[in-house]
Amino acid sequence: MAVYTLLRYTLHTMSGNEIRSRFLAFMEKKGHTIIPSSALIPENDPTTLFTGSGMQPLVPYLMGETHPAGTRLADSQKCFRAEDIEEVGDNRHTTFFEMLGNWSLGDYFKNEQIEWLFRFLTEEVGLSPAKIYVTAFLGDEKAGVPKDVEVSALWQTLFNERGVSHGVADMGSEAEG
C-alpha cells in the first residue's frame, strides 16, 4: 500500500486523511485552487470506463482550454484501474486509490514543482531526505526524445544542499522489485 510506504519513513504516523489535508493545504499556500475529485465514471470520455489517473479529468485543460478555477490547481482524485487487475496484490498494483496532484496550466514548470514536492515530503510529512528516492526520464532514442538532464540537476541540487549524496542506479524490472 502506497500510504504505508510513505508512513514508515515519517517521524510520526500519519493517516491518509492527514496526508491529503496537508498536501492540499500546502498547495493552497502556493496559490493553487483546490478542485473536487471528478466522478469515478467519466461523464464526457467514452474511451474509458473509469477515471484511472489524476490528470485524466484535466486533459482538456492540459491541452490548452482555460480552466474556470485558474492556472494553479490541486486535487485528490479518486482513481480505479482494472487493466492490470491480475497484478493486484503485489507491491506495485492496486485497483482503487486517491492520486494527489498539483497542476500548472502554463504557470510554472519543473523547478518550482520539484522544489515544492521536496519541501512537502521533508517539511510537511517529515521524511528524511536520505530516505527519498527519485527518478528521471532517461530518454527514448526510438522516439527521438532526449534524456531529462534538467530534472536530474534540480534533484541533485536539492539533495546536495541537505548533505545527501546522490547515487545513480538503473531501474529494476517489476520482477526484480
Model-found features: residue ranges?
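Structured aminoacyl-transfer and RNA-binding surfaces used for tRNA recognition/handling
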Residues: 13-177
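Short, positively charged and aromatic/hydrophobic N-terminal segments
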Residues: 4-10
